[in-house]
UniProtKB/Swiss-Prot annotation:
A Pfam family hit: Ribosomal_L5
Function: This is one of the proteins that bind and probably mediate the attachment of the 5S RNA into the large ribosomal subunit, where it forms part of the central protuberance. In the 70S ribosome it contacts protein S13 of the 30S subunit (bridge B1b), connecting the 2 subunits; this bridge is implicated in subunit movement. Contacts the P site tRNA; the 5S rRNA and some of its associated proteins might help stabilize positioning of ribosome-bound tRNAs.
Keyword annotations from UniProtKB, A to Z: Ribonucleoprotein, Ribosomal protein, RNA-binding, rRNA-binding, tRNA-binding
Family: Belongs to the universal ribosomal protein uL5 family.
Subunit record text: Part of the 50S ribosomal subunit; part of the 5S rRNA/L5/L18/L25 subcomplex. Contacts the 5S rRNA and the P site tRNA. Forms a bridge to the 30S subunit in the 70S ribosome.
Highest taxon listed in the record's lineage: Bacteria
Signal peptide interval: none
GO molecular function: rRNA binding; structural constituent of ribosome; tRNA binding
Record HAMAP family: Ribosomal_uL5_B (MF_01333_B)
GO cellular component: ribonucleoprotein complex; ribosome
Highest classification ranks of the organism: Bacteria, Pseudomonadati, Pseudomonadota, Alphaproteobacteria, Sphingomonadales
UniProt name for this protein: Large ribosomal subunit protein uL5
Length: 193
């Protein structure tokens, strides 16, 4: 019988990251060690109030990026200034867990982030205080699944990484060990030199 497939980052977490986190923060129980719970991708399509087809094309692009069919989000309230009615489609979102989450994370860190123009690392202040990290991308074409010739408009998206960490410091260390490119603090840079 063939061995079950394990994503690269899941194997890295089990082999290295969990032990490093336990050594640094001194967890007594293995279930206390923080892990990534889910990754949520959200794409708001502002021009969807005029043309409903824009949401379906955005959803198709997100499906290529995530490898999972997104849910179309609808407006909760009517807003006259935006010509928006309650129930109109205004975007799409997808929640990734388990293997798909680790595979997306691997593609994000190793392929997509290096393709961002003028990229100097992620903002270390984007944690929410409960160990979750939110980041925004300005263009979806950094993902290799999206062909530049076939897109109709460059769109951005929000990526929220939800962890089981209790504090931002634990979550920052967890994501750093996964390979998230946070710029080093000035004090850490002096120690490394």
């Amino acid at each position: 019988m063939a061995d079950k497939y394990t994503p690269r980052l899941k194997g890295k977490y089990d082999a290295e990251i969990a032990a490093a986190m336990q050594a640094k923060f001194g967890y007594k129980n293995a279930l206390e060690i923080p892990r990534i719970e889910k990754i949520t991708l959200n794409m708001g399509v502002g021009e969807a109030s005029q043309d409903k087809k824009k949401v379906t094309t955005a959803a198709a692009e997100m499906e290529l990026i995530a490898g999972q069919k997104p849910v179309i989000t609808k407006a909760k309230k009517s807003i006259a200034q935006f010509k928006l009615r309650e129930g109109m489609p205004i975007g799409c979102k997808v929640t990734l867990r388990r293997e798909r989450m680790y595979e997306f994370l691997d593609r994000l860190i190793t392929i997509a982030m290096p393709r961002i123009r003028d990229f100097r690392g992620l903002n270390p202040k984007s944690f929410d205080g409960r160990g979750n990290y939110a980041m925004g991308l300005k263009e979806q074409i950094i993902f290799p699944e999206i062909s530049y010739d076939q897109i109709e408009k460059v769109r951005g998206m929000d990526i929220i990484v939800t962890t089981t960490a209790k504090t931002d410091d634990e979550a920052r260390e967890l994501l750093r060990l996964f390979g998230f490119p946070f710029p080093q603090d000035a004090a850490e840079q002096q120690q490394a030199a």
